[in-house]
UniProtKB/Swiss-Prot annotation:
Organism (species): Macaca mulatta (Rhesus macaque)
Modified residues (N-acetylmethionine): M1
Compositionally biased spans, kind Basic and acidic residues: 231-240, 248-260, 900-914
Gene3D superfamilies referenced in this protein's UniProt entry, alphabetically: BRCT domain, Zinc/RING finger domain, C3HC4 (zinc finger)
Gene: BRCA1
Location, primary (coarse class): nucleus
Protein name: Breast cancer type 1 susceptibility protein homolog
A single BP term in Gene Ontology: chordate embryonic development
Length: 1863
């Protein structure tokens, strides 16, 4: 359900985005009769005419202020068609999903015309007016009541509601709050309100059949409403007058649906028991409107002025109608359940009223409430429902009304009973009687209302904060919640099926649980519906409110429940939560409503409004999520879960969390309120939250430290993050909280993570604009709450849980993050202007258009969406920064020490942010994002990854490091961050963000968030990691990912600065300075601050990292990978070498950074014990795929970043200067070494070199971090070895093994190599610089560029490698993966300048030549000649790529494309980095390549150093590569040794030691997962997989590793390190190579023993195969070759497959053609199973059991085409002619190239094979027979013969030949 819900949510987001785009800026509704102005802005004709008619003369365009006239307006049929199509899509979406589209108000408008809708709407529509509605409400003129009365009276009479007028009169005072809902102005508000209205409409619809019942309800509801109004009068009195008309309508609704009223009262809906309708709209409207009462009036006036009111009203009406339609569809159930709901609501209201104001205005309610009567009442209600169906169907009769009256009393009794558990069964019966329809109605209503609210909030930036009278609330909440919770638990228990039905029915709408609850509790149902609507509204309107209030309410509820019915309620609630927190939704909604009501009661109107706005935004996202994931019910559940997840937990969670939430939120609010327009809402939110906190200070303080922090931190934080959004999310979150409490957090959190992801995405989006409210509520709340609260609450496990949630969420959060990022970006685009409104607007817009932004981003590559999506915007980086901070804090949270420090820092940051509010507005957003993202690191990580990730990190680190740093960094750095860093961030962010965005688009933002998470986490975490061994391991992983993040994400800016930082703190700072002010700021933030952070966070990180490792080892890979950059920087700052090492290690897990989406896969894989490499690989694939599509973007950004980075690198050349200056020396040295390495390396050289360029860079850093890099190199060497072995499969084998290895490397090296590529290039630079390794040459050449291009390449390589992985996977799937890779690369290259392209092309040509030479050399040379050859080709490509860094990405693209085609994966990953690296200088390029090779084999590097020097000068990669081949083997050996040594070296090197210790001996960067998993076998496996990547990288790794040892020493003295490292490099390489020959040989033997090729597999499946191959040291190639032993086919359960080229070639070659199940089963059984049981038995064309593969394998000597001469003539599709000829040759035929070449009379039978459908000439092939005396057959003869492995008769396949004369 989550997946479908997620998909639905994505679709809904896209539709929402489209809707948003097609909205009229004036009325904020879908454009009707669109007209375009001469300024090309589109508006509704009506809106424009109204605008133009307002004054004489020309008016101004609302958007651009240009003069417009009626004459200038032109009809825009295109837009009208778009709108029509969108409406159709929405309609289809609603039909398909059963969800009421949140923004379907346009349909609702159309639907409004339906009589039922008109009837229903009348009561609600009378509510009236469009823009005048607000005025009416403000004026509370009778005109509206009269309107309502007239319209209502008509529809009410139609509906059978005769008492409409009377009800209106009675309820008018109470109705005001209801009408406030009408006053939502934004389309989103309208959507939300429409939802509310729709609730009301549904209620009206329900009322329609229950006119009399409504009257009855009205009577009781009126009484309740009176009570309620009295209670709420303080809040609603001023609104009552304004809402009189509305009140009338709503009163009907309220009377009809006391439950709604109850929800309303609960949510401070005034005393509108009749507010079923009123309550639905009133609750939600009141929540938003009451909350917004004053604000609503003002806003309504404003909105009216903005002419948004009409749109709002319309949209509200539309939504109402939509809701009504929904209700009408399920009108009978609606009315029934509404009566019951009314009863329930009335009862609860009465209960509440009794508790709150024992006002006896509802004596009947009180009388009706008797629990004793409930059972009979429920029965009556059931009967009435059955009758109400008739009533509804027959007429809106007064019988229904009177029955309704009786029923209402019964319902009230039922409600009482239900609350007392007495009527639960009957309630369930009611529910059962109408489970689906009521649920749907409610779900839709809730959905629409929440959407409405969200839209409103988003558009108008309302932040509804509930300063709920928590005491009152607690009482009311106690009773209501107790009753509701009890009822809910009962209901939940009794209607789990109903809930399921509801969910099934409305899978997408998140209201199912609530709907069920509502249905189950007729009253409860309505109440949940209304409450859920209210909750949705509250959560939408005041997610913060809901959060705070919910928290408070939950606290209150928990407290009161504890006090009153706590044990039972809690138990029941826990049961409920066990049941699925179905009762919880009601509880939550009731709590939310009560909270709202309390908030309303307490002067929370404005704050509630603000909170509601933010909440609405949240809800919108949540709604999307809810809609998709049944979020509303779930959300309610979640809230209830929070509250009721186990009531104890709920109490604790909400009480503690709310407490923490309030405090943290307050901190966040303070911080966030500093952010621009957010401030306006934030203060309210803050106030509300503070009030909440103040109201429940005891609860907060008391509960926070309690177990709730454990649960609440993740759950509540997430709840807070997405109160409304989190409704469903909360459900899951709370479930996850429960899970978290139960140590199930990861899974549940992952589930909730998706929603949280999306909800938080929207929440974060909202929170970004409304950072305090939303971010605070969503992510900020999580982060700050977790950080601050954790600090306050001392809940480190909570932090862990929170991190768990955050990391579990990453997949989902990724979506949210990206969306958030975009939202933030958009919000930041106009951060201060209408920040709240815009932010909220953009929040919803982005939430709605999450997919849309992805589309648009891909579509409009460099358009504004890209910028906001990519966080190119300055605001975005800040957001990212905040996100990063949040993640960092999250990580800190994970580590108790880190958490407290982080929390303190965060709090300091919050305080300082508050102090620096203006400057920190955006920064705060970023900071808060960071904070928020602690709990959902992925989400924020995404943001942080997006652009501000590094900066976020640094800012957070600043915050984390010290309060002082926080203000300085937030104020100063964040400003630079905002401004100067933003630009670097822009380029770097664009590079990273682009890639990330693209990746995120592809990966659902999985990569970036996690990356960012890792990044942020790692900054503190990695920093401390450096200090501690445990942290080292984590730092290895984290640093790896962080390095990748920083190197990959902020590769250009921060990455280079990290690289610069790598050499030393001074270097970091100097490099930062050189990199640029912004970069310096970023680096200083990251690096300088990180040193502090490092120092401060080290212990913290230490604790944290272990925790993180334990909790999210995979995510550590992800997180660590993500976090490595910060770690790197902090490490570098703290321990330059350690930093570099960490960086290098980090760069080993760039996949996480590279592919968070793949990390998702990885997460799933991780579950399979493939966590790290799998995660990396998953990421790699997705990232690769992402890279492909985003590559242009990424490349552009990368190119930009690259250029900038190059400049930065050059500018930061002070540090790099030694590097660069020494690089030539190192190049020479290294090239001498490399010359030895290349021959070996060249095989992997492409990959290795490419990787090496990254690896070299990284290894340069790594050399500084020699131990880490040694580990990495060892792993890489092993990988390289294995890769070599993998590549033993000859060209394709080697190539593909390279690719495979690369893929594996990407998997392993995604952890290792991708980060290696990313971080490696940076590190390599640093290492080159500090180590003076031959790698430096490459880095010299590409150091500046590697910084720029290297960073770019890192990013690209991340993408490239990932895409290569994905491509290899898809290459296996489709042979076009190469072209995909190529296209991706070429698209990336398109971004490069023409000059660069030309250079790259030239270099490409040279590299190709060298590759050819290298291939020849490698074939001749090297222990794996055949493998070497492919490796060489691959390496050559990689080397070419390495060489061509300056050449252009285009050349690289070409090169990569070529390589891709040849070795799709192999070359791209490294080709990119290599290209970029080598782009720096051609000679350098050559050298770089060689150094990359050299890196591959350190010992070879030594020997090659001189040789390479010569080669370098000669530019003969060949020569260099020949030794490289040897060296490669040596390197593998060396690497193996180094792996062994690296551990000791790590131990030797404190900074390096930690990483290596962490990873164990294996190279942590690439071997993190590898060596962590299997130091010996997995490292080899990892390396084998890495080999392709490590093919070069292993050399790099090896090369780096030896130096790294010395670099470890050298790292202490960078200058010395160069020479020492070089020497050590050589010595170590030699020693390793001495030791490693065996390893190499064994690996080669393993690879020779088995070589896999996959066909038809998805990237995920390919990743699994890759893991499998890596585990068993099997070569995994992309192309089949003679060395291939197994072809893994995608088959069905009967081992029947599709026919693919590899299938045919595998059969023709007598290879094992086995099913993919062989791999899966072997993995399951943890042993390699016999292939016999999994051999493919048949195919879909030739038969399902023809046993062709077995026949071919068992008869290798029996060639089916023996004695045949076959000429493959003419064009062929789907298969190259040479492949067809090879296939024929493998089957024993002799191939003839030309028809004239047939050797007639030699005993050979000539046959001509053609493919007629491939011929463009119709009859060209018919005359072939005349050209030669040979039968002409179709290609099918060959294919069928090969598939069956039986030579088929020619007769069937003969092509009739036309006489030559006819031809």
């Amino acid at each position: 359900m989550d997946l479908s819900a997620v998909r639905v949510e994505e679709v809904q987001n896209v539709i929402n985005a489209m809707q948003k785009i097609l909205e009229c800026p004036i009325c904020l509704e879908l454009i009707k009769e669109p007209v375009s102005t001469k300024c090309d802005h589109i508006f509704c004709r009506f809106c424009m005419l109204k605008l133009l008619n307002q004054k004489k003369g020309p008016s101004q365009c609302p958007l651009c202020k240009n003069d417009i006239t009626k004459r200038s307006l032109q009809e825009s049929t295109r837009f009208s068609q778009l709108v029509e199509e969108l409406l159709k899509i929405i309609h289809a979406f609603q039909l398909d999903t059963g969800l009421q589209f949140a923004n379907s108000y346009n349909f609702a408008k159309k639907e409004n015309h339906s009589p039922e809708h008109l009837k229903d709407e009348v009561s609600i529509i009378q509510s009236m007016g469009y823009r005048n509605r607000a005025k009416r409400l403000l004026q509370s003129e009778p005109e509206n009541p009269s309107l309502q009365e007239t319209s209502l009276s008509v529809p009410l009479s139609n509906l059978g509601i005769v008492r409409t007028l009377r009800t209106k009169q009675q309820i008018q005072p109470q109705k005001k709050s209801v009408y406030i809902e009408l006053g939502s102005d934004s389309s989103e508000d309208t959507v939300n309100k429409a939802t509310y209205c729709s609730v009301g409409d549904q209620e009206l619809l329900q009322i329609t059949p229950q006119g009399t019942r409504d009257e009855t309800s009205l009577d009781s509801a009126k009484k309740a409403a009176c009570e309620f109004s009295e209670k709420d009068i303080t809040n609603t009195e001023h609104h009552q007058s304004s809402n009189n008309d509305l009140n009338t309508t709503e009163k009907h609704a309220t009377e009809r649906h006391p439950e709604k009223y109850q929800g309303s009262s609960v949510s401070n809906l005034h005393v509108e028991p009749c507010g079923t309708n009123t309550h639905a709209s009133s609750l939600q409207h009141e929540n938003s409107l009451l909350l917004t009462k004053d604000r609503m009036n003002v806003e309504k006036a404003e909105f009216c002025n903005k002419s948004k009111q009409p749109g709002l009203a319309r949209s509200q009406h539309n939504r109402w109608t939509g809701s009504k339609e929904t209700c009408n569809d399920r009108q009978t159930p609606s009315t029934e359940k509404k009566v019951d709901l009314n009863a329930n609501a009335l009862y609860e209201r009465k209960e509440w009223n009794k508790q709150k104001l024992p006002c006896s205005e509802n004596p009947r309610d009180a009388e009706d409430v008797p629990w004793i009567t409930l059972n009979s009442s429920i029965q009556k209600v059931n009967e009435w429902f059955s009758r109400s169906d008739e009533l509804l169907s027959s007429d809106d009769s007064h019988d229904g009304g009177s029955e309704s009256n009786a029923k209402v009393a019964d319902v009230l009794d039922v409600l009482n009973e239900v609350d007392e558990y007495s009527g639960s069964s009957e309630k369930i019966d009611l529910l059962a009687s109408d489970p689906h329809e009521p649920l749907i109605c409610k779900s839709e209503r809730v959905h629409s209302s929440s959407v409405e609210s969200n839209i409103k909030d988003k558009i108008f930036g309302k932040t509804y904060r509930r300063k709920a009278n928590l005491p009152n609330l607690s009482h009311v909440t106690e009773n209501l919640i107790i009753g509701a919770l009890v009822t809910e638990s009962q209901i939940m228990q009794e209607r789990p099926l109903t809930n399921k039905l509801k969910r099934k029915r409305r899978t997408t709408s998140g209201l199912h649980p609530e709907d069920f609850i509502k249905k189950a509790d007729l009253a409860v149902q309505k109440t949940p519906e209304i409450i859920n609507q209210g909750t949705n509204q509250m959560e939408q309107n005041g997610q913060v409110m809901n959060i705070t209030n919910s928290a408070h309410e939950n606290k209150t509820k928990g407290d009161s429940i504890q006090n009153e019915k706590n044990p039972n309620a809690i138990e029941s609630l826990e049961e409920e939560s066990a049941f699925k927190t179905k009762a919880e939704p009601i509880s939550s909604s009731i709590n939310n409503m009560e909270l709202e009501l309390n908030i309303h009661n307490s002067k929370a109107p404005k704050k509630n409004r603000l909170r509601r706005k933010s909440s609405t935004r949240h809800i919108h996202a949540l709604e999307l999520v809810v809609s998709r994931n049944l979020s509303p019910p779930n959300c309610t559940e979640l809230q209830i879960d929070s509250c009721s997840s186990s009531e104890e937990i709920k109490k604790k969670n909400y009480n503690q969390m709310p407490v923490r939430h309030s405090r943290n939120l307050q901190l966040m609010e303070d911080k966030e309120s500093a952010t621009g327009a957010k401030k306006s809402n934030k203060p309210n939110e803050q106030t509300s939250k503070r009030h909440a906190s103040d109201t429940f200070p005891e609860l907060k303080l008391t509960k926070v430290p309690g177990s709730f922090t454990n649960c609440s931190n993740t759950s509540e934080l997430k709840e807070f993050v997405n109160p409304s959004l989190s409704r469903e999310e909360k459900e899951e979150k709370l479930e996850t909280v429960k899970v978290s409490n139960n140590a199930k957090d990861p899974k549940d959190l992952m589930l909730s993570g998706e929603r949280v992801l999306q909800t938080e995405r929207s929440v974060e989006s909202s929170s970004i604009s409304l950072v305090p409210d939303t971010d605070y509520g969503t992510q900020e709340s999580i982060s700050l709450l977790e950080v601050s609260t954790l600090g306050k609450a001392k809940t480190e496990r909570n932090k862990c849980m929170s991190q768990c949630a955050a990391f579990e969420n990453p997949k989902e959060l990724i979506h949210g993050c990206s969306e958030d990022t975009r939202n933030d970006t958009e919000g930041f685009k106009y951060p201060l202007g209408s920040e709240v409104n815009h932010s909220q607007e953009t929040s919803i817009e982005i939430e709605e258009s999450e997919l849309d932004t992805q589309y648009l981003q891909n579509t409009f590559k460099v358009s504004k969406r890209q910028s906001f999506a990519l966080f190119s915007n300055p605001g975005n980086p800040e957001e990212e920064c905040a996100t990063f901070s949040a993640h960092s804090r999250s990580l800190k949270k994970q580590s108790p020490k880190v958490t407290s420090e982080c929390e303190q820092k965060e709090e300091n940051q919050g305080k300082k942010e508050s102090n620096i509010k203006p400057v920190q507005t955006v920064n705060i957003t970023a900071g808060f994002s960071v904070v928020c993202q602690k709990d959902k690191p992925v989400d924020n990580a995404k943001c942080s990854i997006k652009g501000g990730s590094r900066f976020c990190l640094s800012s957070q680190f600043r915050g984390n490091e010290t309060g002082l740093i926080t203000p300085n960094k937030h104020g100063l750095l964040q400003n630079p961050y905002h401004i100067p860093p933003l630009f670097p961030v822009k380029s770097f962010v664009k590079t990273k963000c682009n890639k990330n965005l693209l990746e995120e688009n592809s990966e659902e933002h999985s990569v970036s968030p996690e990356r960012a998470v890792g990044n942020e986490n790692i900054i503190p975490s990695t920093v401390s990691t450096i200090s501690h061994n445990n942290i080292r391991e984590n730092a290895f992983k984290e640093a790896s990912s962080s390095n990748i993040n920083e190197v990959g994400s902020s590769t250009n800016e921060v990455g280079s600065s990290i690289n610069e930082v790598g050499p030393s703190d001074e270097n970091i700072q100097a490099e930062l300075g050189r990199n640029r002010g912004p970069k310096l700021n970023a680096v200083l933030r990251l690096g300088l601050l990180q040193p502090e952070v490092c120092k401060q966070s080290l212990p913290i990180s230490n604790c944290k990292h272990p925790e993180i490792k334990k909790q999210e080892h995979e995510e550590l890979v992800q997180t660590v990978n993500t976090d490595f950059s910060p770690c790197l920087i902090s490490d570098n700052l703290e321990q330059p070498m350690g930093s570099s090492h960490a960086s290098e290690v980090c760069s080993e897990t760039p996949d996480d950074l590279l592919d968070d989406g793949e990390i998702k896969e990885d997460t799933s894989f991780a579950a399979n014990d493939i966590k790290e490499s799998s995660a990396v690989f998953s990421k790699s694939i997705q990232r690769g795929e992402l890279s492909r599509s985003p590559s242009p973007f990424t490349h552009t950004h990368l190119a930009q970043g690259y250029q900038k980075e190059a400049k930065k690198l050059e500018s930061s050349e002070e540090n790099l200067s030694s590097e660069d200056e020494e690089l030539p020396c190192f190049q020479h040295l290294l090239f001498g070494k490399v010359s030895n390495i290349p021959s070996q390396t060249t095989r992997h050289s492409t990959v290795a070199t490419e990787c090496l360029s990254k690896n070299t860079e990284e290894n340069l850093l790594s050399l500084k971090n020699s131990l880490t890099d040694c580990s990495n190199q060892v792993i890489l060497a092993k990988a390289s070895q294995e890769h070599h072995l993998s590549e033993e499969t000859k060209c394709s084998g080697s190539l593909f093994s390279s690719q495979c290895s690369e893929l594996e490397d990407l998997t392993a090296n995604t952890n290792t190599q991708d980060p290696f590529l990313i971080g490696s290039s940076k590190r390599m630079r640093h290492q080159s610089e500090s180590q003076g390794v031959g790698l430096s040459d490459k880095e010299l050449v590409s150091d500046d560029e590697e910084r720029g291009t290297g960073l770019e390449e890192d990013n690209q390589e991340e993408q490239s490698v990932d895409s290569n992985l994905g491509e290899a996977a898809s290459g296996y799937e489709s042979e076009t993966s190469v072209s995909e890779d190529c296209s991706r690369l070429s698209s990336q290259s398109e971004i490069l300048t023409t000059q660069q392209r030309d250079t790259m092309q030239d270099n490409l040509i040279k590299l190709q030549q060298e590759m050819a030479e290298l291939e020849a050399v490698l074939e001749q040379h090297g222990s794996q000649p055949s493998n070497s050859y492919p490796s060489i080709i691959t390496d050559s490509s990689a080397l070419e790529d390495l060489r061509n860094p300056e050449q252009s990405t285009s050349e690289k693209a070409v090169l990569t494309s070529q390589k891709s085609s040849e070795y799709p994966i192999n070359q791209n990953p490294e080709g990119l980095s290599a290209d970029k690296f080598e782009v720096s200088a051609d000679s350098s390029t050559s050298k770089n390549k060689e150094p990359g090779v050299e890196r591959s084999s350190p010992s070879k590097c030594q020997s090659l150093e001189d040789r390479w020097y010569v080669h370098s000068s000669s530019g003969s990669l060949q020569n260099g590569n020949y030794p490289s081949q040897e060296e490669l083997i040596k390197v593998v050996d060396v690497e193996t040794q180094q792996l062994e040594k690296s551990g000791p070296h790590d131990l030797m090197e404190p900074s390096y030691l930690p990483r290596q210790d962490l990873d164990g001996t294996p190279y942590l960067e690439s071997g993190i997962s590898l060596f962590s998993d299997d130091p010996e076998s997995d490292p080899s496996e990892d390396r084998a997989p890495e080999s392709a990547h490590v093919g070069s990288i292993p050399s790099s790794t090896s090369a780096l590793k030896v130096p790294q040892w010395q670099v470890a020493e050298s790292a202490q003295s960078p200058a010395a390190a160069h020479n020492t490292n070089t020497a050590g490099y050589n010595a170590m390489e030699e020693s390793v190579s001495r030791e490693n020959p065996k390893l190499t040989a064994s690996t080669e033997r393993v690879n020779k023993r088995m070589s896999l090729v996959v066909s038809g597999l998805t990237p995920e499946e390919f990743m699994l195969v890759y893991k499998f191959a890596r585990r068993y040291h099997i070569a995994l190639t992309n192309l089949i070759s003679e060395e291939t032993t197994h072809v893994v086919m995608k088959t069905d359960a009967e081992f029947v497959c599709e026919r693919t080229l590899k299938y045919f070639l595998g059969i023709a070659g007598g290879k094992w053609v086995v099913s993919y199940f062989w791999v899966t089963q072997s993995i399951k059984e943890r042993k390699m199973l016999n292939e016999h049981d999994f051999e493919v038995r048949g195919d879909v064309v030739n038969g399902r059991n023809h046993q062709g593969p077995k026949r071919a394998r068992e008869s290798p000597d029996r060639k089916i085409f023996r004695g045949l001469e076959i000429c493959c003539y003419g064009p062929f599709t789907n298969m190259p002619t040479d492949q067809l000829e090879w296939m024929v040759q493998l089957c024993g035929a002799s191939v003839v190239k030309e028809l004239s070449s047939f050797t007639l009379g030699t005993g050979f039978h000539p046959i001509v094979v053609v493919q007629p459908d491939a011929w463009t000439e119709d009859n060209g092939f018919h005359a072939i027979g005349q050209m030669c005396e040979a039968p002409v057959v179709t290609r099918e003869w060959v294919l069928d013969s090969v598939a069956l492995y039986q030579c088929q008769e020619l007769d069937t396949y003969l092509i009739p030949q036309i006489p030559h004369s006819h031809y």
